[in-house]
Amino acid sequence: MYNVAIVGASGYTGGELLRMLLNHSEVEVNNITSRKYDGTPAHKIHPHIRDSGLVFKNKQPSELDADIIFTATPHGASMKIVPDLLETGTKVIDLSGDYRYRDTKVYEKWYGLEHTSDIKGVYGLPEIYRDEIKKADLVGNPGCFPTGAILSSYPLVDNDLVDRIVIDSKTGVSGAGVNPSSTTHYPNIADNVNPYKISSHRHVSEIQQELHGFEDVKVSFTPHLVPVIRGIQTTSHSFLREEHSDITPDELRKFYEKTYGKEYFIKLMDDGEIPHLSSVRGSNFVHIGGFEIDDTGRIVMLSCIDNLVRGASGQAIQNMNIMLGLDETTGLNHFGLNP
């Protein structure tokens, strides 16, 4: 058994980490930290894990005796503690944005924070960077929007098929975090669709890093808040390069089958089948569909993920499994909750 600790376990992602790790056959959670809830039993904050026996403690990094540590802290906090954690010889998976970027200047521009650590993490998207993750001591867990957007578009840029991608994502309110605000107040979200940060959401920089890095691909992104609790539905409009303007939907599908055909957590929908949020809720699966091309050369791809699982904690556990040499699906091979 491997010992696991979670730094900052009181939020939604921390709760999901606990839910899944407590059902994981190869690990034991031995420490969960929180300054705010020091001394509080975990089930007082996360009532769904009653009788886990876990209690929040305000511990220093050097006091965490673990083989692998998840840092589920606010942006800017992880970079202050991760170097000390790595010095103890443990492996770290960071769920904040602090270690997702290859260029810290990009992070500083979009997060408005000075990056004080010169340590580089591996970008934790297993279907693309599995070999790098296997050897990593530090993994930067991808953001929720980038996970669905990148996976639904990656075969297009990897095969140099498109030169422009316009991404539209609908997200549930849990993506805004555990603290209430006027944005997530029920009367403001019910019976409504709220676009926000329509051209300036920080996750566009993460998507651009992973998609623009292949070729001269221009990426645009707009998120919308919708009145559901969990899930991100992404529609990607990608525009074919002129030299590929005669590609057919069947040929398009073959690129995705070649890329994802052996990937357990990625499910490609049949022709005419639309992925739904309700099908992935509570699971680590990514459902991808669409595969349509219109007369203008626009490819329409769709994806659905659970933002708290595949978009955060489930993907972090998938990365943990890879880093520890375990079967990648351990603790994650459960299907979604429907209805």
Curated annotation (Swiss-Prot):
GO CC field: cytoplasm
Any one Gene Ontology BP term: L-arginine biosynthetic process
Pathway field: Amino-acid biosynthesis; L-arginine biosynthesis; N(2)-acetyl-L-ornithine from L-glutamate: step 3/4
Pfam families: Semialdhyde_dh, Semialdhyde_dhC_1
Catalytic activity: N-acetyl-L-glutamate 5-semialdehyde + phosphate + NADP(+) = N-acetyl-L-glutamyl 5-phosphate + NADPH + H(+)
Record's subcellular location: Cytoplasm
Top EC group: oxidoreductase
Keyword check for Amino-acid biosynthesis: yes
Location of the active site: 144
Entry EC no(s): 1.2.1.38
GO molecular function terms noted in the UniProt entry: N-acetyl-gamma-glutamyl-phosphate reductase activity; NAD binding; NADP+ binding
UniProt keyword list: Amino-acid biosynthesis, Arginine biosynthesis, Cytoplasm, NADP, Oxidoreductase
UniProt family annotation: Belongs to the NAGSA dehydrogenase family. Type 1 subfamily.
Protein function: Catalyzes the NADPH-dependent reduction of N-acetyl-5-glutamyl phosphate to yield N-acetyl-L-glutamate 5-semialdehyde.
Name this polypeptide is given: N-acetyl-gamma-glutamyl-phosphate reductase
Source organism (scientific name): Methanobrevibacter smithii (strain ATCC 35061 / DSM 861 / OCM 144 / PS)
Gene (UniProt): argC
